[in-house]
Amino acid sequence: MQHSSVTSPRAAIYQWFSQLLFQELTEAQLVTLGGRESRAWIASLSTIPGLASDVKRFERSLTRVLHREAREQELAADFASLFLLAPPVGVSPYAGHYPHTTPAQERRQMNALLVEQALAPRENEASDHIAIQLALMAEQISREASVATQYYFLQHHILCWAPLFMASCQQREAEGFYVLAVAMIVHFMHEDAQYLESLLMDNVYCRNH
């Protein structure tokens, strides 16, 4: 990732996917998604290395969703069947349900991080939900947290389980709207981690020369 092409939209990307994965989309949100500005923004993500094919698949899925006769209700059903049903039928969007940690431990750590940023879980949602973790990442970027802080949070709180989350989603429905959204944000996070790592290496090099 090139610094100039990534720095400005990073927070917006995390925030956008946070909102997309937090709860069922309303008709008003679907109207916005189908608008010219939103479609252009989504298309612009294809310029990020590694995301072009993900973006194309997501755009096709979004077009199908927007043309459904009862799109709000049908997409809500998709969301519920994927994220609201207990595993193994559904897929847990909570970090604490994955092998690297426990619900109590992850939520305790997330709650502490949210307090540091003067934030609180949205609508009483458990703080280890993928959407809240993405929102916190967006907040760290917006507040210009150190590169090391961003990198640590991304690696130790999201990327340590998000690939497993993505794989479980893909096992349920390879081309579903939410499955493709999850794949896109996970692949973006891998690219973002490499970007942050390159900045850390640059910092080390500058200190040593």
Curated annotation (Swiss-Prot):
HAMAP family: TorD (MF_01150). PANTHER family: CHAPERONE PROTEIN TORD, CHAPERONE PROTEIN YCDY. NCBIfam families: PRK04976.1 (NF003442). Gene3D superfamilies: 1.20.120.1820, HscB, C-terminal domain. SUPFAM superfamilies: TorD-like. Involved in the biogenesis of TorA. Acts on TorA before the insertion of the molybdenum cofactor and, as a result, probably favors a conformation of the apoenzyme that is competent for acquiring the cofactor. One of its GO terms (biological process) is protein folding. Belongs to the TorD/DmsD family. TorD subfamily. It is found in: Cytoplasm. Keywords: Chaperone, Cytoplasm. This is Chaperone protein TorD. It holds the Pfam family Nitrate_red_del.
